[in-house]
């Protein structure tokens, strides 16, 4: 080996030694981000995702090249812990919401205290593997000898910073541009956060989310342009045009009793296990009612509160976080408000903490005169997260009798809440081979709630309270998280499941019962929680001005739009997180046509219209003009 070669080798080794902490940080964070990606998407390991992940870490690393090694080692150690905690939070959030946590969602973190059992059940011991390197790094840091390379002057540090930053930014820009070219509105709308994370990596996602949050806050502090306001007004006017004749005014003057059932998912209806009906009472009442068997939930970060929000306002959930929390200062043209204009009394019933999901604020905002919350009930029996559905419905019935007619009463149940671990409270129900599984526990929980709902509805009928009342009952959201999809597929005898098999099971039951069991039958129209208020507005002869949904009884449209950008028109189903279309009848993949592409862009526009309405409190402005 000649002297020149030896010189360059020594120089290379010195540079490696001088930057060993940066190299080690890059490798550790890369492994962690890739492991997270594998957890949210089994097909995550593909060549394209390496580039944005490495680039995002290079951008982080570049800033630390300006510091002395002794100082930056400590800073990198702290950053490693911070990123690890973010990844752990992300994966726990994903297990329940099937989404990536955002800055807006973090604002709702205090709400998790009310469902601590749910959160704890989502934590896996393996999650702490994200922190395992910390254990080994502490002793290594103590023994690590810092290099005092006096030759490394400030100018060289700046050059290294610029070079590392430019390489990272160049690679990152290419990756982000490729995504924006494939789906032009994805980055600005964040409509499908899982797919975006899959394409550009977790660090990039959170950086873009933070940027969007800040820029949106700044943008929303200014008034929306007159042109944009007019565009939204024109859409609302067209969407709410109606020449409805089917059941128009059929419920006018009648009481409305609306029941939102916790985690009531559609697959349990008319289903048996070991020869026993899972929901015998709901099955019986469905046969006496108008039943909608293709009714989808569309909740996002607000979960149960989103179901309430859509059903009472026909506006989409917040882009991020919960509308009940983020937009409690807005004005609404809610179902309760419009019924009050017709001299209805309005009351909401839910036995959980009044402040949970900000209900104590949002119920009055939406026009409810009374809110019977936790402190309005005698907590004499607990099942699940709080007061049992049995006691809740019995006490609610007594309160209903005191309301001046006509009234709108909105009841939200609780006992069948995830993680369905109160099997003793649920009582005996033989689930056979599913004993001890999450699905088995859920079947016990929903069977219990079904029994209480049956008793409640039977009492309403027996006491002739249904003679002048419309009853609406629907499920709020999914029961089986995607982490447990194999249990659901096994129960439904589905082999080689596709993404379409998953999405077609994201339906919830919804039925409308009329006095004397009138208008009973099955409506197969593809519909959703966004469509409930417009449908009831037609039946109760209420004004329709600010609704983004459709009247199911007077529409042949199968439009259902989900917050993540997925949609169906009743014929095709677009799954946004894989950018794939399926034929609804056959379940087979189909190619994107120009018509489907145009629909996708239009539906994303409608989501953005809803966001603008909420962000700029437009209903207040529209009503004032």
Residue ranges and their predicted role:
Residues 107, 123, 224-227, 239, ...:
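Short coil/turn linker and secondary-structure boundary residues
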Residues 106-113, 122-132, 205-213, 362-384, ...:
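Short alpha-helical interface patches
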Residues 74, 101, 118-129, 221, ...:
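Generic alpha-helical structural element
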């Amino acid at each position: 080996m000649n002297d020149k070669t030896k010189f360059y080798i020594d120089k290379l080794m010195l540079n490696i030694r001088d930057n060993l902490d940066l190299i080690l940080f890059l490798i550790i964070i890369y492994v962690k981000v890739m492991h997270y990606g594998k957890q949210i998407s089994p097909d995550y390991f593909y060549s394209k995702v390496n580039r944005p992940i490495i680039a995002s870490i290079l951008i982080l690393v570049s800033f630390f090249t300006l510091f002395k090694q002794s100082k930056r080692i400590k800073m990198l150690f702290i950053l490693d812990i911070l990123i690890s905690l973010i990844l752990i939070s992300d994966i726990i959030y994903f297990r329940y919401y099937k989404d990536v946590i955002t800055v807006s969602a973090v604002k709702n973190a205090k709400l998790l205290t009310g469902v601590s059992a749910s959160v704890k059940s989502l934590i896996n011991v393996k999650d702490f593997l994200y922190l395992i390197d910390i254990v080994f790094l502490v002793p290594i840091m103590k023994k690590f000898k810092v290099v005092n390379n006096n030759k490394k002057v400030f100018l060289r540090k700046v050059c290294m910073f610029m070079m590392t930053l430019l390489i990272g930014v160049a690679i990152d820009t290419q990756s982000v541009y490729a995504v924006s070219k494939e789906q032009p509105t994805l980055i600005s709308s964040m409509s499908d956060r899982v797919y975006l994370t899959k394409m550009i990596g977790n660090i990039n996602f959170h950086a873009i989310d933070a940027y969007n949050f800040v820029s949106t806050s700044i943008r929303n502090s200014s008034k929306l342009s007159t042109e944009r306001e007019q565009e939204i007004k024109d859409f609302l006017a067209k969407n709410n045009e109606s020449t409805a004749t089917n059941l128009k005014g059929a419920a006018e003057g009648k009481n409305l009793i609306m029941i939102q059932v916790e985690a009531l998912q559609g697959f349990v209806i008319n289903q048996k296990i070991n020869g026993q009906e899972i929901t015998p009472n709901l099955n019986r009442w469905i046969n006496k009612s108008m039943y909608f068997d293709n009714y989808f939930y569309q909740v996002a970060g607000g979960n149960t509160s989103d179901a309430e929000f859509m059903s009472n306002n026909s506006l989409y959930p917040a882009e991020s976080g919960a509308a009940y929390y983020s937009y409690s200062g807005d004005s609404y043209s809610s179902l309760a408000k419009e019924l009050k204009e017709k001299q209805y009394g309005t009351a909401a019933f839910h036995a959980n903490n009044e402040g949970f999901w900000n209900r104590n604020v949002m119920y009055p905002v939406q026009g409810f005169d009374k809110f019977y919350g936790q402190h309005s009930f005698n907590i004499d029996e607990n099942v699940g997260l709080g007061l049992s559905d049995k006691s809740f419905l019995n006490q609610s019935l007594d309160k209903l009798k005191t309301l001046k007619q006509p009234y709108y009463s909105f009841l939200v149940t609780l006992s069948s809440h995830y993680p369905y671990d109160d099997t003793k409270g649920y009582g005996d129900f033989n689930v056979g081979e599913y004993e001890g599984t999450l699905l088995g526990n859920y079947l016990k929980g929903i069977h219990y709630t079904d029994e209480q709902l049956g008793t409640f509805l039977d009492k309403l009928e027996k006491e002739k309270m249904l003679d002048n009342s419309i009853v609406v009952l629907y499920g709020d959201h999914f029961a089986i998280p995607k982490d447990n999809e194999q249990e659901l597929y096994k129960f439904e005898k589905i082999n080689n499941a596709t993404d379409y098999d998953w999405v077609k099971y994201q339906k919830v039951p919804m039925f409308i019962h009329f006095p004397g069991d009138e208008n009973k039958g099955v409506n197969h129209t593809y519909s959703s929680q966004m469509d409930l208020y417009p449908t009831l507005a037609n039946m109760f002869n209420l004004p329709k001005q600010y609704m983004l949904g459709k009247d199911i009884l007077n529409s042949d449209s199968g439009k259902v739009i989900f917050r993540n950008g997925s949609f169906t028109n009743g014929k095709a189903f677009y799954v946004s997180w894989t950018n794939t279309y399926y034929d609804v009848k056959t379940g087979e993949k189909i190619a994107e046509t120009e018509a489907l592409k145009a629909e996708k862009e239009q539906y994303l526009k409608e989501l953005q219209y809803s966001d603008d309405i909420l962000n700029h409190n437009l209903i207040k402005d529209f009503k004032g003009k």
